[in-house]
């Protein structure tokens, strides 16, 4: 898929993006699932419009060694939509800035918004901004943000099972980033990883 300004009206699709860069603009008609896995993001902007009776699921993982800026914007212009955003970010070095904004416009009803955003600070820092702009009383909305380091107790537990510290960290990071994806997308990631070795 071309990484420059993709504009599409999508009916019932799953889009898998691996290490894509640039800006993306989509309009959801019925159902859209976007799986994104990016290593070494610099700047990425995604804007999605939901009109009526649609389901949008965004599963996004970002692993960064350099400073990056990620912007996810969803505009809900209609009624009876569901928007679920799952984000996992690992800041390996430098600063990572992530902004996730969902806006439900005035005079809309029956919409549901869920933002589940998690950051892992390895040797860098991560800032995650969950933004809900709600101009109506007729919406169910929730957001969750968790940021922290790898759990040293889990590393110690894996070491007690004979796994060295570096492999224990790799296992925990892989679990952290893969748990939002379905098996088909994980297979794509594993195939890509196998081809890069």
Regions found by a protein language model. Name each.
Residues 196-197:
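Short acidic DE-rich linear segments
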Residues 2-163, 171-179, 184-192:
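Conserved beta-strand/loop scaffold segments within soluble protein domains that form the structured core
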């Amino acid at each position: 898929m071309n990484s420059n300004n993709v504009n599409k009206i999508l009916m019932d699709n799953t889009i898998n993006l691996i290490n894509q860069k640039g800006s993306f603009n989509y309009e959801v008609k019925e159902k859209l699932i976007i799986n994104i896995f990016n290593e070494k993001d610099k700047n990425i902007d995604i804007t999605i419009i939901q009109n009526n009776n649609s389901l949008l699921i965004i599963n996004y993982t970002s692993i960064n060694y350099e400073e990056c800026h990620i912007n996810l914007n969803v505009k809900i212009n209609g009624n009876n939509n569901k928007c679920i955003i799952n984000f996992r970010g690992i800041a390996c070095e430098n600063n990572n800035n992530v902004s996730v904004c969902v806006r439900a416009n005035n005079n809309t009803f029956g919409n549901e918004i869920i933002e589940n955003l998690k950051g892992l600070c390895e040797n860098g820092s991560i800032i995650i901004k969950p933004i809900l702009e709600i101009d109506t009383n007729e919406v169910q909305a929730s957001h969750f943000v968790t940021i922290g380091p790898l759990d040293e107790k889990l590393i110690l537990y894996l070491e007690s099972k004979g796994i060295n510290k570096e492999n224990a960290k790799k296992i925990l990071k892989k679990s952290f980033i893969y748990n939002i994806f379905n098996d088909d997308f994980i297979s794509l990631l594993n195939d890509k990883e196998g081809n890069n070795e």
